[in-house]
Each structure stands twice: as structure tokens, then as C-alpha cells.
Regions:
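Charge-rich, low-complexity N-terminal segments
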Residues: 1-13, 193-243
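N-terminal alpha-helical "arm" segments
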Residues: 1-44, 335-347
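Hydrophobic alpha-helical segments and helix pairs
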Residues: 6-24, 152, 156-193
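Short, Φ-rich (hydrophobic/aromatic) sequence segments
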Residues: 17-20, 193-201, 292, 297-300, ...
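Short alpha-helical segments and helix-capping/turn motifs at coil-helix boundaries
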Residues: 31, 198-202, 311
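Assembly/oligomerization interface modules of large self-assembling protein complexes
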Residues: 33-100, 154
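Long, contiguous amphipathic alpha-helices that act as assembly "spine/axial" helices in icosahedral shell
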Residues: 84-166, 189, 193-221, 322-329
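Sequence/fold signature of self-assembling virion shell proteins
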Residues: 184, 229-347
Length: 347
């Protein structure tokens, strides 16, 4: 039975076909940075920020008053889930192929033709996920841009503001963890600045742990300057033999330049989402720090909870007697629950 979109005629749900052309993962996904925490039928979703604490255990006499552990710090932020659409008009014959693929005994006979219909739509969803994740990491806020390229009021929230975190808690005691670095200065060792960040993360993490990796993601221009800096030339020269194992641990980075040195992993970002003179530092393996929440489709069935929440949706609707519309959509929001553990440098 066709799903009904609000105020429109019947739709046929072809969402399973989105899996036919898998989304290509961006660098942040290959690193395993963002985890999917929730699939919700609500239009507003809740993110929790937990700050762990450590209690000191003192030596006491047996039978003496006992010590008690404190409570964990927790804050919540309510964020609207932005909704995105990408449609395409196709021929009725293309729809027949979609139906045939879903019902055919031998679907391989039409697979290649169906893939062409889905592939263009899926590339748009790939770009959407990249924008959502990089906006969170680079600009410390949710992604919801309108057609004019401007942030949509009510949907875009700064994470530091949402969790009411004072600048004093942020790296460099600055809003959004902003800082500056001069990679052209050969008299100053950049490692000193990155060591300052490493200590900041350990001090603010609150869990006493040392099992997470520290990553410095760099625009290509900044990475080249670091590679050519007098204090790093030798490190890069001696690194080639270890580069490939590291790539595998970080999800098989194929084209980016990488260096692991003195407890920090430097990675060149080639996505185009980080400017040449920008640098982002953050810890990996921090549980639930980078989250994705997905919302429901814009159909009556989804609104009533009768349609499963998914990462993307695909529907077919007749436009007129000669044309058919393919309607794809997604509802998702990213959140960084520990923004105080991120540094954002500008040259």
C-alpha cells in the first residue's frame, strides 16, 4: 500500500533501493568519528553531555565512616532535526525497472539500469552527510542551510552555547576553542602548541583515561607547511615505513598524507571542507562525543510510527501522465557533546 505524504496523493516507498548504491564514506566516517546514537520519530531530539569524575579513595580504619562516590555531571541539549530533500523526474519506464528489481525472480537483469537511477540521488546524500559532519567539527554547530546558503533560524545551534559551557573550559579559554598558530615561524616549534592541546584534553576529559588517540586534522596548505617546518622535517623523513599500518588503523585513508609523532596523529584533509589555513584537533575513541541522530520521513505512515526510521528515504510519485517523480529525503543532525575537547587553529 502506498504511503501518503501530507497534503498529497499516494506515494510508493522504494527506500530499500537506496542500499543498492551504498553511500561512499567521507574521511570522518572512515575514521569512525561519528556514531549513530538514535533513530527517532520526534522532530526534536535530545543529546546528553556527560562529564565523568574521579573519586579519591583514602585509607581508613575498618569500621570507620565510609566514603561515597560523587555524581557524574550531565547536561542535555534539545536540537531540532533538519529535514532535507532531493528529487528527480524520471520516465515511467524507469519506474517499471525499479518495480521489476524489487519483485523479479532474477533482479540482476535490471540491476545496472536501476543503479543509474539511484546513483545520482545517492551522491546528493553523500554530500549531505559530509556537510553535516564537517559543519559540526569545523564550525562547532549543527548544519541546516537554506537554498540561499544561509543558516536556518531555529535549526542551527552552537554546541558550546547549547550545553552552556564557559569559555574558561574551552581550549585556549576561547569561544569554540579558537587559537592561532604560525607555521611559517621556523624559530617556534609547532609541537609545543600541539602538546599544550594534548595536556588540555587529558585534563578536561575527566575519565583519567589514556586509551584515546589525538588527531590533528589539517588543511592541505597547513599540512605542507608542517611537513616543511625545520622541527618536523626529520620526523617526516623517518616515518614512511610506518605510514601504511597507521592508515589501516584510521580506516584506510588512501590519498591523505599522515604523520604520527609524539602522541599526536597529523592527517591532511582533502575533502575541501577544511580551509588551507585551518587546523582542527580532537580526541578519537571518546565514547558518544560525536553523535548522529536520524529522524522520520515526511509521510503520514512515518508520523504515525508505522514506517521505520532510516538514514534516507526514497519514494515514487506520478507527476503527470508522462512523468514520474523520484523523491528522496533525509532528516539528521550531528552533535558534539564535548566541545571543550576540540581545538580550532587558524594560521
Amino acid at each position: 500500500m502506498a504511503d501518503l505524504r501530507f497534503g498529497e496523493q499516494g506515494l510508493q516507498n522504494f527506500t530499500p533501493l537506496m542500499d543498492l548504491v551504498p553511500r561512499q564514506e567521507n574521511m570522518l566516517q572512515r575514521m569512525g568519528l561519528f556514531s549513530v546514537v538514535d533513530y527517532t520519530t520526534e522532530k526534536v531530539t535530545e543529546f546528553e553531555r556527560r562529564v565523568l569524575g574521579i573519586d579519591t579513595m583514602y585509607s581508613v580504619e575498618r569500621g570507620a565512616d565510609r566514603q561515597y562516590a560523587g555524581d557524574e555531571g550531565a547536561q542535555t541539549a534539545l536540537l531540532k532535526i533538519p529535514f532535507f530533500t532531493l528529487d528527480k523526474v524520471i520516465k515511467p519506464s524507469d519506474v517499471d525497472q525499479l518495480r521489476e528489481f524489487l519483485t523479479a525472480t532474477d533482479p540482476e537483469t535490471v540491476r545496472s539500469r536501476v543503479e543509474k537511477v539511484i546513483a545520482r540521488i545517492q551522491r546528493g546524500h553523500v554530500e549531505l552527510h559530509k556537510n553535516v559532519m564537517y559543519e559540526a567539527l569545523v564550525n562547532n554547530k549543527t548544519y541546516a542551510k537554506g537554498k540561499d546558503g544561509n543558516d536556518r533560524v531555529g535549526y542551527v545551534k552552537n554546541f558550546q552555547t547549547a550545553f552552556e559551557i564557559d569559555n574558561a573550559e574551552m581550549y585556549n579559554a576561547a569561544a569554540d576553542g579558537a587559537a592561532t598558530i604560525d607555521l611559517d615561524d621556523q624559530t617556534a616549534n609547532p609541537a609545543d602548541e600541539f602538546e599544550k592541546f594534548r595536556k588540555h584534553v587529558f585534563n578536561k576529559a575527566g575519565d583519567g583515561g589514556d586509551n584515546y588517540r589525538l588527531v590533528v586534522l589539517m588543511g592541505s596548505g597547513s599540512f605542507t607547511k608542517l611537513k616543511n617546518h625545520s622541527d618536523y622535517v626529520e620526523a617526516f623523513a623517518n616515518y614512511a615505513s610506518n605510514e601504511e599500518p597507521l592508515r589501516q588503523r584510521l580506516g584506510g585513508l588512501r590519498t591523505s598524507r599522515v604523520l604520527e609523532w609524539q602522541g599526536v596523529t597529523y592527517i591532511e584533509d582533502v575533502s575541501g571542507k577544511i580551509a588551507d589555513d585551518k587546523i582542527i584537533g580532537f580526541p578519537l575513541d571518546m565514547e558518544d562525543m560525536f553523535q548522529l541522530h536520524y529522524g522520520h520521513a515526511d509521510t503520514i505512515a512515518a508520523q504515525n510510527g508505522d514506517e521505520a526510521v532510516s538514514e534516507a528515504y526514497l519514494y515514487v510519485r506520478e507527476v503527470d501522465g508522462r512523468r514520474v517523480g523520484v523523491e528522496s529525503e533525509a532528516a539528521l543532525v550531528a552533535c558534539i557533546t564535548r566541545p571543550e575537547l576540540i581545538a580550532r587553529w587558524s594560521e
